Amino acid sequence: MVKLAFPRELRLLTPKHFNFVFQQPQRASSPEVTILGRQNELGHPRIGLTIAKKNVKRAHERNRIKRLAREYFRLHQHQLPAMDFVVLVRKGVAELDNHQLTEVLGKLWRRHCRLAQKS
């Protein structure tokens, strides 16, 4: 049985972890969301979220976006390559409803899977 937990090992926790991704990222972008990824040596994917107050003003909207990104990652972690991912959002993401945002995230993570298979 596949575990769908979201323990600390699956999260980017320190600035050092985030900087590792920002140095040489692979990008997958849409007008509202960008997912940066970089191969890691851990054998499992990890995720970090950066949602600036400048781009999404209201806290409940930022929390909704983070919740949806974490949930998509949690449910699909076993299909993702062993990479560190950072999810960045732009203005306009708050106008997307939950279904649209989930579709955008899915499309971007599938693109990262294809990029990882090529390299």
From Swiss-Prot:
Phylogenetic lineage: Bacteria, Pseudomonadati, Pseudomonadota, Gammaproteobacteria, Enterobacterales
Family classification: Belongs to the RnpA family.
Pfam families recorded: Ribonuclease_P
E.C. no: 3.1.26.5
Enzyme class: hydrolase
GO cellular component terms, A-Z: ribonuclease P complex
Record note on quaternary structure: Consists of a catalytic RNA component (M1 or rnpB) and a protein subunit.
GO molecular function, one term: ribonuclease P activity
Domain of life: Bacteria
Name of this chain's protein: Ribonuclease P protein component
Function: RNaseP catalyzes the removal of the 5'-leader sequence from pre-tRNA to produce the mature 5'-terminus. It can also cleave other RNA substrates such as 4.5S RNA. The protein component plays an auxiliary but essential role in vivo by binding to the 5'-leader sequence and broadening the substrate specificity of the ribozyme.
Keywords assigned by UniProt, alphabetized: Endonuclease, Hydrolase, Nuclease, RNA-binding, tRNA processing
SUPFAM superfamilies linked: Ribosomal protein S5 domain 2-like (SSF54211)
Example of a GO biological process term: tRNA 5'-leader removal
Substrates-to-products reaction catalysed: Endonucleolytic cleavage of RNA, removing 5'-extranucleotides from tRNA precursor
